[in-house]
C-alpha cells in the first residue's frame, strides 16, 4: 500500500472507478447479448427493439470513455447489418 496521502487517496479512487466501470461494462454486455439472442432466434421485431434500447447505452459508454467511440460505431453497424439481413 502507498505511504503518501495522495497516493492512498488515488488507490481508493481507482478501486471505486474500477468497480463502477465493471458494473457499466457488464450492463453494456447484457444489452448486447439481448440483441444477439433476438437475432439468433430470428425475431426481427425483438431484435430491433433490443437494438434501440442498446444504442444509447453504447453511445453513453463511448462518451464516458469506457469503450472507444469507433468500437461503439463498429458494433452498431454490425448489429444493424445483421438485423437488416433477417
From Swiss-Prot:
Family annotation (Gene3D superfamilies): Ribosomal protein S20 (1.20.58.110)
Organism superkingdom: Bacteria
GO molecular function terms listed in the Swiss-Prot or TrEMBL record: small ribosomal subunit rRNA binding; structural constituent of ribosome
Region annotation (Disordered) ranges: 1-26
One Pfam family from the record: Ribosomal_S20p
Keyword Hydrolase annotated: no
Alphabetized NCBIfam families for the sequence: S20
Function text: Binds directly to 16S ribosomal RNA.
PANTHER family in the record: 30S RIBOSOMAL PROTEIN S20 (PTHR33398), SMALL RIBOSOMAL SUBUNIT PROTEIN BS20C (PTHR33398:SF1)
The protein's name: Small ribosomal subunit protein bS20
Source organism (scientific name): Photobacterium profundum (strain SS9)
Lineage summary: Bacteria, Pseudomonadati, Pseudomonadota, Gammaproteobacteria, Vibrionales
